[in-house]
Each structure stands twice: as structure tokens, then as C-alpha cells.
Regions:
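Glycine-rich P-loop/Walker A and Walker A-like loops and their local beta1-loop-alpha1 context
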Residues: 2-66
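Long, charge-dense
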Residues: 69-115, 119
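Conserved P-loop NTPase "ATPase switch" module shared by AAA+ and STAND
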Residues: 128-144
Length: 197
């Protein structure tokens, strides 16, 4: 019987092999024939296991002839907050402020002039014909932004295969359950990989 630690490894490796197959034939396997956007779905408790495997998976994708580029949503969020000039003020007020107020202020920075979406679009637009973008740290969007809002805003702006590493649960062909916290959302139209275990 496999140890509890090895179960996520097997599930994650199966999902990664499924992703490689999808990336090898993206047009045939995208049922909605939309932008080349994919969700690599895994259970939230496997976040660290995915992070540990990411460098190895990037190496495998390189061996497959791709040019993988990692784009961290955590880095983008931090940069946008830093550029807002509000970081120091928030740190000073943090002990007095209600968490909901701080979250709302961060949400406003990310949404103002579509800052988060535009920054993501700019990062995924860079690269060559064999580029694959791996969009990581999706879990850090909670509670500021929903991933589907980013997907919807990126329609027509995804020139390279882009894989969103999504901690949650897959429900059918188009449904996702983010972090096991939010209700199921059945309106995703991109290709979903993994997340059925």
C-alpha cells in the first residue's frame, strides 16, 4: 500500500503526463476552441508538492521542445501593491484595521484600470513560438480576485499555451471548485487537466 506522502506524487505525475499530452496536440483537445489556456488542477493540500516539482517539470517540457516560462501571480500582486505606494501605510495601519478593509484596499489596487489582468496579459505575451507560460501561485489571489475573472478578461490575449496551476477540485468538463472554499463554478471554458482524483 502506498504511503500517504506518495499518493499526491502519483496523482500529480499522472496529471503532468496528461498536461504533456494536451500540450502536444492543443487544438484537437480544446473542446471550446478558445485561447490556448489550460488549468492544471490539484488539491489545495498539494500546493507544496506542486511547487517542489515545478522546476523538474519545466526541465521535462524543455526536453519536449518547449520554452517554459514561469510567471508568478504572487510576484505580480506584490509588484502592483508596491507600485501603488500604499504598502508602508498599510503596514502601519494593519494592527488597527479590520481584515476586510485591508482586503478591500488590496482588491482595489489589483482591479484599478485592470492592473492585474493587464500585467498578466503583458507577461504571457512575451516569448517565442515554443513558449509555454506556467502561471503559478493562483492560491494567492484569494480573497482578492477570482481566476475565472482573469480568464474572461484574457480572451483573445493569450498568444502562447498558458497553464494556470489551480489548487482546487475539478467538477466535470468545465467546473472548478477553487481552494475547496468557493462554490463550484461551472463556467470555465479552457481545457482542464487533473483534479479528478
Amino acid at each position: 500500500m502506498p504511503s500517504p506522502d506518495s499518493v499526491p506524487l502519483e496523482v500529480l505525475e499522472r496529471a503532468f503526463q496528461e498536461l504533456r499530452a494536451v500540450l502536444g496536440q492543443p487544438d484537437r483537445l480544446n473542446p471550446a476552441h478558445s485561447d490556448p489556456l489550460y488549468y492544471f488542477v490539484y488539491r489545495p493540500q498539494h500546493v507544496l508538492a506542486v511547487k517542489r516539482r515545478l522546476a523538474g517539470w519545466m526541465g521535462i517540457l524543455r526536453n519536449d521542445g518547449f520554452e517554459p516560462v514561469r510567471v508568478s501571480l504572487a510576484d505580480i500582486v506584490h509588484e502592483l501593491i508596491d507600485e501603488s505606494g500604499r504598502w508602508e501605510a498599510w503596514l502601519e495601519l494593519e494592527h488597527e484595521a479590520e481584515p476586510g478593509d485591508v482586503n478591500q484596499a488590496i482588491r482595489e489596487v489589483l482591479a484599478r484600470n485592470r492592473a492585474l489582468v493587464n500585467c498578466v496579459a503583458e507577461r504571457i505575451a512575451a516569448g517565442g513560438p515554443r513558449t509555454i507560460v506556467l502561471l503559478t501561485e493562483d492560491e494567492l489571489l484569494h480573497p482578492y480576485f477570482r481566476t475565472r475573472a482573469i480568464e474572461s478578461a484574457l480572451v483573445g490575449r493569450v498568444p502562447h499555451p498558458t497553464v494556470i496551476f489551480y489548487p482546487g477540485r475539478r467538477v466535470g468538463q468545465y467546473g472548478l471548485h477553487f481552494l475547496g472554499y468557493y462554490p463550484e463554478d461551472g463556467n470555465y471554458r479552457s481545457t482542464l487537466v487533473g483534479g479528478l482524483e
